[in-house]
Each structure stands twice: as C-alpha cells, then as structure tokens.
C-alpha cells in the first residue's frame, strides 16, 4: 500500500520518513504550523530519495508556478477549489504529478448521497491521484462510510486523523489505494520514528486482513 508521511520540516525528519514511506510532503503557502519556507523545501526536495509533494491551499496558478520553479518538485498536492483549466495548464507546462484533495464530512446522515455528490465532483476533474480528507490537514477523522463507497470506484489516498491506533481498522474497512498521515505520527510537533514504525506495521496488517 502507498504510504505518504507528510509535513516534514528538517533533513532529520526526511531520513526517518524515507525508511518507511513511499512519499513525503512539505507544507507551503497555507496556514499550518508545519509550513516551511521555499528555501527549506528546495533543500528537502534535493536531498530526498522519495517523491516530495508540495502541499498547498493555493488556487492561483502563479503560486503553483513559483512553488514548482523554486523547489524543483514534480509532485503537487492541491487542497483548494482550483479549476481543471488551471490544472491542465500546470500539467502541460511542467509535467507534474497532481494529487487533488476532496473533502469528506466528519459525519454524514446519508453516506450514499454524500458519496455520490463527491464522486460527481471527482469526475469533473482529471488528476493523477485522488485524496480524501476531512479538510485541509485538520487532523480529524471523517465519516469512513462515505470514503469506503468512493474507494470502491476510484483508487484513493485516505487522510484525516490517522494514527497508529486507528489505522489498522480504517484500512480494513475503507480498503484505500494508499494513506497519508502527518500529525498522527508526531511527538512534540516532530516526526517520531517509533510512531511511524508502528503506524506502517498496522497499515500492512490492515492491508493484508482477510474476512
């Protein structure tokens, strides 16, 4: 299963993440305590042996152009209402791999109806990967009944409030293509290797679970 460990800030965190994850991410141009500067991001991209996603809430193409050109990354994670025309421009101009976030409600009174609405929104986009999140890296879980329905139709990456204690059952239930974690593997606002190790072990247990 694809595992992305997001929100790194230092080379030390990068080295830990590289031992366990398939990809990582740096937070740029958005309101987050994990936000880092372009120079730091560029350094991490250059040091990395795994893909580094530039994560941002920007909807302006020029902001994404600055991110790409300064950091040198070819991987973008978009948490905004950016339109398909802008995405097409970025892909044609820079050839980037784009993961687009779609918001799932924390609780749903009608999971099937909510899932159909989100599926319709997803189908209006052409991107490389779909991320289902509770909302802009808030660190809260969402209604997995909704994401389970969507995961039956698309290869999705699941995010939102994941941690070593809940990820096994969530992976078993939703059956995503991949998962994305940040705050759930931190201790004192830094990536914790023991938490990451336990998280990844439980992801694999959930992935290999058979009814």
Curated annotation (Swiss-Prot):
Gene3D superfamilies assigned: Aldolase class I (3.20.20.70)
Top class in the EC scheme: isomerase
Example GO biological process: L-tryptophan biosynthetic process
UniProt keyword annotation of Ion transport present: no
Gene: trpF
Pathway: Amino-acid biosynthesis; L-tryptophan biosynthesis; L-tryptophan from chorismate: step 3/5
Protein name per UniProt: N-(5'-phosphoribosyl)anthranilate isomerase
Record-listed E.C. numbers: 5.3.1.24
Keyword Metal-binding: no
Keywords: Amino-acid biosynthesis, Aromatic amino acid biosynthesis, Isomerase, Tryptophan biosynthesis
Family assignment from sequence similarity: Belongs to the TrpF family.
Domain of life, per lineage: Archaea
Catalysed reaction, written as an equation: N-(5-phospho-beta-D-ribosyl)anthranilate = 1-(2-carboxyphenylamino)-1-deoxy-D-ribulose 5-phosphate
Entry GO MF terms: phosphoribosylanthranilate isomerase activity
Coiled-coil positions: none
Pfam families the record matches: PRAI
HAMAP family per UniProt: PRAI
